[in-house]
Design a protein with these regions (language model features):
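The core hydrophobic/aromatic register in alpha-helical repeat solenoids, strongest
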Residues: 276, 348-351, 514-517, 599-602, ...
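Replace the tail clause
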Residues: 3, 17, 32, 39-509, ...
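Alpha-helical positions within canonical tetratricopeptide repeat
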Residues: 295, 299, 361-364, 368, ...
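Long, K/E/R/D-enriched contiguous segments that form extended
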Residues: 489, 501-611
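Long, polar/charge-rich, low-hydrophobicity segments
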Residues: 378-385, 565-593, 598-761
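Intrinsically disordered, low-complexity cationic segments
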Residues: 7-10, 32, 42, 610
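N-terminal chloroplast transit peptides
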Residues: 1-29
Length: 808
């Protein structure tokens, strides 16, 4: 965000803030599980105004919703409404301020706020009498959430969910916060009502000022007139410097510079691992570039090693929790999000390719990727082919028990001893299991994990093998078998709540990540016993990624088939954002961009031109719906009269920026569909330039965009392979092209038995080569590399292909 514009909002907010209370006092220490919003949570003086108890004019309508998050609130005494033109018109007719609560189904603190306040009859009476109350699923309506979250972040310096916004009936916000603990929320309602009744004009004035400031803030302008000027500002070096400052050299991962605490820690692949992989392959000679490459690789790998060994990883069932509340990656916030699983697999395999074959870090990356794939394919894949969104942070230890955070995942020592018998001592030693539990009380403010254990690597395989008189491979086998026994026993517990809506954007991320292990590992041989011995020294488990990769391509194809059948309307050429018992709201930019990215990967994995042609159709529709004709780049959503600020999605978060992904897609299209090279290249450049202020001033906020600039600086290349998919040499050519980490390349496979005639109409090089195949000039298996509009001579032997791929 641009600081000057943020301060505009901040000053307006402070005026409003002072009008709410002259005697604000901070509340008790905020729970360590989430980051507080400094100015959003206060101990407010109780108003003398009391709520009356008339029959509410509105009733709770969420039972009609299809959103799992909204359905969680269908039995609240609060008269919740869905975000809609009808609801907004009703608020204006009733002339009441609006209370907007935005969250998502897997959010622990959303559940806490609901239990403490929204399920409370007295609080609900106040809310129903004084406000029109609207619930928003941020995953279905990110456009609504994004606008008000920008306000919250600008005035408080932070944000999070649940997001709580008070606004005028005209949708102009005048007060914001996140989670308000009991009784503060009750008191806040009194105070907001008092101020609205006594000084409504000031609230409305502040709200109008906020909207104008948000409009200014969303208009970032340009700092560079050309891509060369933007590259000359050295964004990659600046990004590396920022990441180096925030890097935790002891435990891995990244923290906020100057923070007094080292947690929480998020995977945040688009901000950390994705750009680090690019930096680790940055071009150029000299000591400085060599240092950046080595340090970036180690920063990313240190983070992956820590996540592999930490409690953030579900050792029993696979998959990764959303974040760790502590610096050591031991105590997770237990919700599991599909977007994290998807991005982590991609990042693991990016880093794997930065190391030689059979290097211990390469194998560790394979192992972690397999662990995540195992979980997503087993527990998040719907029978129809799409992937569900998330599993909840809260769960019950047994059916009928009160839900608490992480109950499904944590263990008493007595439980482990009973299940594992004679193997329990070795298992307990490896995972640091204690009779009284191993969770520090400072990370368990509500005492929900008292006496329980979070599994995390406490000792190495070598250490426990020595301790119990075993060989390392024996110790490893015991632990693998023990984890499976615990998983089967754990299935008797009540599983965490499942958010079973299917989101286009997140499924697009899944298509991308499913293609990568298929391309890298499909039909690779199992590791040999000597390699397993080397692996033991690296303290990793058996990389089952070699076996699980065969499931990846069918799963990716299943997603695309589901989207085409349920979420794509060919008559209007539009996507929907979500699907659950029917279509959800209209799709947004990230839905198009992430799905396009996945389809381009799917084309490279299969050689089936239908995927790139569908991607092209989606790209044209994305341009029609979201392109900014004035300043370039993409708006995050389509025009909507009730979303007062049409914003651009420039900054990365838990997911990459849709704008940055779009720029990368456009660069790939410029090669694949070279007949429109100038159009795609111009749009890619304009998209990067639209993010220019952030790229030059705050590169870490746009790490994915900087990654794309690194690719552009290296120069994109097109690897063209000609020959039958069943030809052994072709398989080796494709394997060689995929194994080396080149994020700036596209692979085109021309198969004589299935010539890509549709692609040939849009790519002159492919068209010419198809003519050569049909005329008999191209008979043998070959590989060539094209760069800058020029193709090199073909090579027809594997060694020559490897050298060519290495040298380019």
């Amino acid at each position: 965000m641009v600081v000057s514009n943020c301060s505009h909002i901040g000053n307006s907010y402070l005026l409003m803030f002072r009008s709410l209370s002259r005697t604000l006092k901070p509340i008790a220490p905020f729970p360590r599980h989430i980051r507080p919003t400094p100015r959003g949570i206060y101990h407010l003086r109780m108003s003398s105004t009391s709520a009356t108890d008339p029959t509410p004019r509105l009733s709770n309508v969420l039972a009609k919703s299809k959103s799992p998050y909204l359905l969680q609130h269908k039995d609240n005494p609060v008269a919740w409404q869905e975000w809609s033109p009808e609801t907004i018109a009703l608020a204006q007719k009733l002339d009441k301020p609006i209370f907007l609560s935005s969250g998502y189904s897997a959010c622990h603190w959303c559940h806490v706020l609901a239990h403490e306040s929204f399920e409370d009859e007295d609080t609900a009476k106040m809310m129903n009498e004084w406000f029109v109350n609207i619930k928003v699923d941020r995953e279905e309506r990110p456009d609504v959430d994004r606008m008000y979250m920008s306000y919250l972040q600008a005035v408080s310096g932070g944000g999070g969910w649940p997001m709580s916004i008070f606004m005028t009936p005209k949708l102009e916000p005048f007060f914001a916060g996140t989670y308000f603990p009991r009784p503060n929320f009750h008191q806040l309602l009194n105070k907001i009502h008092e101020v609205w009744e006594e000084d409504r004009e000031k609230c409305e004035k502040m709200g109008k000022g906020v909207i104008e400031a948000l409009k200014d803030m969303s208009d970032t302008g340009r700092t560079s007139e050309s891509l060369s000027q933007l590259l000359a500002s050295s964004p990659a070096s600046k990004l590396f410097a920022q990441l180096s400052t925030m890097n935790d050299t002891r435990y891995g991962g990244f923290t906020n510079a100057g923070s007094s605490t080292r947690g929480p820690k998020f995977p945040s692949c688009s901000i950390t691992l994705e750009p680090l992989a690019r930096l680790a392959s940055i071009p150029g000679g000299g000591a400085r570039n060599a240092e950046i490459r080595e340090d970036a690789r180690e920063m990313g790998m240190k983070m992956l090693r820590s996540m592999w060994s930490g409690g953030i990883r579900d050792w029993v069932g696979g998959g990764m929790a959303r974040y760790s509340v502590d610096e050591k990656w031991m105590v997770p916030h237990f919700e599991k999000m599909l977007y994290d699983q998807a991005q982590l697999v991609s990042s693991c395999l990016d880093f794997a390719r930065l190391y030689p074959a059979n290097h211990q870090d390469r194998l560790l990356c394979y192992d972690l990727a397999a662990d995540i794939l195992k979980y997503t394919l087993r527990d998040l894949k719907s029978p129809e082919g799409g992937f569900w969104s998330a599993e909840d942070a809260d769960s019950a230890e047994y059916k009928g028990a009160k839900k608490s955070e992480g109950a499904f995942y944590i263990w008493k020592k007595t439980e482990i001893d009973e299940i594992l018998g004679d193997d329990a001592p070795l298992f307990d030693s490896f995972f640091g299991v204690e009779p009284d539990g191993n969770v520090n009380i400072i990370h368990d403010s509500h005492g929900e994990m008292r006496g329980k254990n979070i599994l995390h690597q406490h000792k190495t395989f070598e250490e426990v093998a020595l301790e119990f008189g075993k060989r390392e491979d024996q110790a490893k086998d015991i632990i693998i078998e023990a984890c499976e026994k615990l998983r089967l026993k754990r299935e008797e517990r009540e599983r965490p709540g499942l958010d079973d809506k299917i989101l286009t954007a997140w499924n697009g991320l899944m298509v991308r990540q499913l293609c990568i292990p298929y391309m890298l590992l499909h039909k690779s041989p199992q590791l040999t016993v000597p390699q397993l011995t080397a692996l033991s020294k690296a303290s990793t488990l058996l990389p089952s990624s070699y076996g699980i990769s065969s499931q990846c391509l069918p799963a990716a194809l299943g997603i695309v088939n589901f989207v085409k059948s349920h979420m794509w309307d060919p008559s209007t050429r539009t996507l929907t954002r979500s699907y659950r018992e029917g279509k959800g709201p209209q799709a947004q930019t990230d839905d198009y961009a992430f799905l396009i990215q996945g389809l381009l990967n799917l084309y490279e994995a299969t050689g089936d031109e239908s995927h790139v042609l569908f991607a092209e159709e989606l790209q044209k529709r994305q341009d029609e719906l979201f392109w900014d004709d004035d300043d370039g780049g993409y708006f995050a959503s389509a025009e909507d009269a009730h979303v007062l600020v049409r914003m651009k999605d420039a900054q990365d978060g838990a997911e990459p920026s849709a704008a940055a992904v779009s720029a990368h897609n456009l660069s790939r299209f410029s090669l694949l569909l070279s007949s429109e090279f100038e159009n795609y290249e111009a749009r890619a450049e304009a998209t990067f330039l639209s993010m220019g202020p952030l790229i030059t001033q705050a590169p870490r906020a746009v790490g994915y965009a900087v990654s794309g600039l690194i690719d552009l600086e290296k120069g994109y290349r097109e690897v063209i392979v000609i020959g039958s998919a069943n030809d052994e040499m072709i398989k080796e050519f494709l394997k060689a092209a995929r194994e080396t980490y080149f994020s700036n390349q596209v692979i085109v496979h021309i198969q004589p038995e299935k010539l890509p005639k549709g692609l040939a109409e849009k790519n002159e090089v492919v068209k010419a080569l198809i003519n050569d195949v049909e005329s008999g000039k191209e008979k043998e298996a070959s590989l060539r590399v094209c760069e800058g509009g020029t193709c090199g001579l073909p090579v027809k032997d594997l060694e020559g292909a490897k050298n060519l791929l290495k040298d380019v």
